[in-house]
From Swiss-Prot:
Biological-process GO terms, alphabetical: translation
Name of the protein in question: Small ribosomal subunit protein bS20
Membership in a protein family: Belongs to the bacterial ribosomal protein bS20 family.
Superkingdom of the organism of origin: Bacteria
UniProt GO MF annotations: small ribosomal subunit rRNA binding; structural constituent of ribosome
Gene of this entry: rpsT
């Protein structure tokens, strides 16, 4: 491991703000990817509930899809239109099965 760079007073060396932004962007990318994966998993569970045809699991799955889509918009991961499109398509599929 390389030795840490320090200033004359012994504290850690300051980073330029471009480096800070790169680090922040990398952290947010990983967090956003995990949330997108969670959203896709919830949608797959909803699709499985539709194939099974159980009404209670369909309604609970639809609630999960709504919740995840709204949280993604709140966090800035999905845009409003994408969440609306996801919820609309899920509702249409649920109404056909119920």
């Amino acid at each position: 491991m390389a030795p840490k760079k320090t200033t004359k007073k012994g504290g850690p060396q300051k980073r330029p703000s471009a480096e800070k932004r790169i680090l922040t962007a990398q952290k947010r990318y990983l967090i956003n990817q995990s949330f997108k994966s969670k959203a896709k998993t919830m949608m797959k569970k909803f699709e499985a509930a539709l194939k099974a045809g159980d009404q209670s699991s369909i309604t609970s799955g639809l609630q999960l899809v709504y919740s995840v889509a709204d949280k993604a918009v709140k966090r800035g991961i999905f845009k409003n239109n994408k969440a609306a499109r996801i919820k609309s398509r899920a509702t249409l599929r649920a109404n056909v099965k119920i």
